[in-house]
Amino acid sequence: MKKILEKYIPEWLELSLITFLYTISNIWLLLNRGMYWDDQTWLTLLKLNKWQTFWITLEQQKQYAQYYVMKFLALSGDVFLATRVLAFLCWLISAFAIYLIMKRVFKIETLTAFLVTTLFALSPLFFERVISSIVLYSLSTALFFLGALIYWLVANSGRWYIRWSGIAISAVFFFISFFTNSFLVFFYGFVLLAIFHDRSLLTHWRTKLLWMLLLPILFWTIKETGGDPYGLTANYNQFVIGQPGWVSKMIADLWSGIYCGLIWPLTVPWALLERKIFAIVFIIALACSWLATRLVAGSGKSEDSIGYKAYLWWGVVIFAFGLIPYVLVGKSPHPHAFQMRHAMLLPIGASLIYWGLLALIVKEKYRAFVVSVICALFITWSIYNYFTLDMDWYKQRAIIARLQEQSVQLTTRPTLIVFYDEIRRFGWMNRPLTLSDHFGNITEALGTTTTVGIPVEEEQSVKDIYALREWMTGDPTPKNMPNVIHLSIVSKSGQRDLVTVKNWLQVKKVELFGTEEEYKKTIDDTFDIHLVPRRLSEKSKWDIEVEKEYK
């Protein structure tokens, strides 16, 4: 078996070790059953079998690819698991493609290619891959890097039919990846790299380069024939250039992207080491990373002929092409409210920059160990994030159970529930639950969309909230004045810290292997979360708005 692998996939050892480290870091992605952000809208509609409403919602946004991806995944019978498996595989496939490009195309030394690829595979920048409603982003990423690999493997083939069929396949993969529109810009970073690698693209530009230059334009032209987004998302992703204050906005977004894409991932995990359990996780992850590195180093070594300047230069170029499409529409990445989804294209550029800096300032014999430390930090941070995402979901499950207990009171007439979240420590990144979260939880608990839940911090007006609900569900704004109820989300466990790994693993075990009733009971017994009527000394802005709207 080993001889067969060495003959057809000589890189089998490195790819196996990349898979090993990636799985250690992301196995909890496959075990996550939570709904977050837009999942609470999209997947709730799918649960209600409202495919027509789901289509109308996405048609207004011109997100046809999103619809068909979810339609296809629904055939599995478990959209949650299907999206998690797809996201898991897509990023692993992307890592494989990057490693093979570095090894087979650019002839980079084995250990260097392995370390750079591992930094990419373990990067915590796009942690939003857990969100089912944006699984298209992960699919686009895999198709893009596969397209790049196929192109470079066949571009100089002596057999014309292999060359042109391979280029055609890569063009199809690139074209599909453009449904995540940021790849329209990122693609030109690939074009620059292709020219750098093969200067004949310039001398034979009509046959070799022209199709690359025109492919994104062709996609954009076809996309524009479908019309502009309309409805509540008509102005989504509008260019900021020319808008008031656009220069300062773009500068701030650029800095946010640079900080969150390069500095934040290296600094934030260190705080976790103050907690004993995550210090242990770090030590285990470091041992695994170092062992993998030594195995690769021992499999054979050749001198890396590419200097640090090339890694830094191309790292900066690719990082810039990954950041610019988001800065242009005012969507800079930052680590709150799932906004790091705008860092989706940054991991490969960041990995090259990290390696270039290490090659510049760290002696060669220490570089592999430093990368192992960084990888261990990334693994620790990822496991911590999966832990907090699960705790976020368990909190939501407890709220659903409490709402079910009050179903009679909440469904006899249109109701607007104002939630006061007093246990944000349960939330991922201490986030409060959003309008979408409450929509999904209430619909799951009560089986109806006539009751609306909002966080007390919500900035939209009552009128806009009901318009948004109508857009999402097709249910019209209630004709009768809704009853306004104020509820505090609390835990009656006193001052005990319940957000612990021990509690997480205890509930996770029952979630995966127990019955639904056992799962609910374990959450209730462990976290003791309740909805308590909130007494107000005066009318809230929500009471006043509702009365004003229905006068």
Q: PLM features: what roles do these ranges have?
A:
Residues 98, 102-122, 141-142, 366-369:
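Transmembrane-helix signature of polytopic, membrane-embedded enzymes
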Residues 163-181:
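Membrane-interface alpha helices of multi-pass inner-membrane proteins
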Residues 333-360:
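Hydrophobic/aromatic-rich transmembrane helices and adjacent perimembrane loops
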Residues 144-166:
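Membrane-interface transmembrane helices that cradle and orient dolichyl/undecaprenyl
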Residues 80, 84, 114-143:
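Aromatic- and kink-enriched transmembrane "portal" helix at the membrane-lumen/periplasm boundary
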Residues 358-382:
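Signature aromatic-anchored transmembrane alpha helix within multi-pass, membrane-resident enzymes
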Residues 5-6, 11-61, 70, 74-82, ...:
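Intrinsically disordered, polar/acidic, low-complexity terminal segments
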Residues 3-4, 186-217:
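Perimembrane helix-loop-helix junctions
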